[in-house]
C-alpha cells in the first residue's frame, strides 16, 4: 500500500466510468449487476469494490488490511457510493450470513492464507446456490521459481510439496510482494478443493502478462516464460440431495 504498487493502484476516473469493461471483460458476471449482492474477497486498494458499486451493485469488501479498506472507503465516499468494508481474513467470514451473496469477485489473495480449502468452505457458505465466483490465483510454479533467470533458464528452487509459509523472496516484485507472508497451494487444492466445497468450474483462463522483448529479470520477461496467474469462473452448486451417488467403473450396475 505504501509504495502504490501494481496490486494497490486505485481506479482512475476513466476506469470508474467503465467498471465492467475493466473488471469483467469476459462478461462472466452476466452483464447488468444493478442491485446484485457482490462480495469482494481482497480490497484491491480502491479498485474492485468502488468500481462494482459504481456499476450499481451492493458491495461488501473483505480484507485483512485496514489500509486497503481505507482506500476503498475514500474512493467510494469521493464518488458518493455505498461500499461496506469488513476487516477480516478471507478464511474467516463468520460475520456474514449464509447464502448472502449472488456473486463473488476475488483478485489475487488466496496465496496469503495457509489453508485454501478452509477459505473455499467459508466462501461456499455465504454464496447463494447458482452464484458465480470469479477469481485469480497465483499458480504453484509462480511461487517456486525466482524472478531472474540463470544462464540455464529459470530454476525451480522451492519444492512443489512445500509446507508452511514461503521464505521471503530473494528479489521482491509483482510476483512476490515485499512484506507479505505467502503460501504455495497445489493444483489439487486450488481446483480440487473448490469442487469439493460445492462449486462447478466453468472456465479457466491464463491472463497474459508476458513480453518476449522485456528485459531479463523483469516481471514481463518472466511472464513470457510462465503464466503467473490463472483466472477461474465457478458456479456455486445446489446442495446435493442425500440420495445422489457418484458412479465409478467399479460400481455395481
Protein language model annotation of sequence segments:
Residues 181-204:
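Short alpha-helix
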Residues 91-104:
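A short acidic, Gly/Pro-enriched loop at the edge of an enzyme's catalytic core
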Residues 6-36:
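Conserved alpha-helix/loop element of class I SAM-dependent methyltransferases that forms part
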Residues 117-132:
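A short glycine-rich, Lys/Arg-flanked "PGG" loop and its adjoining helix->strand segment in the class I
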Residues 102-117:
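A short SAM/SAH-binding and catalytic strip from SAM-dependent methyltransferases
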Residues 36-93:
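Class I SAM-dependent methyltransferase SAM/SAH-binding core
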Amino acid at each position: 500500500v505504501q509504495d502504490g504498487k501494481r496490486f494497490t493502484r486505485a481506479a482512475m476516473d476513466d476506469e470508474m466510468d467503465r467498471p465492467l469493461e475493466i473488471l469483467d471483460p469476459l462478461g462472466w458476471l452476466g452483464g447488468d449487476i444493478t442491485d446484485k449482492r457482490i462480495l469482494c474477497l481482497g480490497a484491491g486498494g480502491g479498485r474492485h469494490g468502488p468500481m462494482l458499486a459504481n456499476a450499481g451493485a451492493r458491495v461488501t469488501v473483505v480484507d485483512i488490511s485496514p489500509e486497503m479498506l481505507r482506500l476503498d472507503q475514500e474512493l467510494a465516499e469521493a464518488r458518493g457510493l455505498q461500499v461496506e468494508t469488513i476487516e477480516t481474513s478471507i478464511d474467516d467470514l463468520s460475520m456474514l450470513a449464509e447464502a448472502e451473496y449472488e456473486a463473488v469477485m476475488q483478485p489475487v489473495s488466496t496465496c496469503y492464507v495457509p489453508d485454501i480449502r478452509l477459505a473455499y468452505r467459508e466462501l461456499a457458505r455465504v454464496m447463494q446456490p447458482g452464484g458465480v465466483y470469479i477469481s485469480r490465483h497465483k499458480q504453484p510454479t509462480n511461487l517456486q521459481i525466482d524472478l531472474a533467470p540463470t544462464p540455464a533458464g529459470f530454476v525451480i528452487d522451492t519444492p512443489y510439496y512445500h509446507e508452511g509459509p514461503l521464505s521471503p523472496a530473494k528479489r521482491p516484485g509483482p510476483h512476490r510482494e515485499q512484506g507479505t507472508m505467502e503460501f504455495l497451494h497445489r493444483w489439487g487444492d486450488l481446483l480440487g478443493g473448490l469442487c469439493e466445497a460445492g462449486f462447478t468450474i466453468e472456465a479457466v483462463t491464463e491472463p497474459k502478462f508476458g513480453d518476449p522483448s522485456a528485459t531479463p529479470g523483469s516481471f514481463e520477461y518472466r511472464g513470457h516464460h510462465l503464466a503467473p496467474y490463472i483466472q477461474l469462473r465457478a458456479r456455486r452448486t445446489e446442495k446435493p440431495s442425500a440420495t445422489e451417488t457418484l458412479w465409478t467403473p467399479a460400481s455395481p450396475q
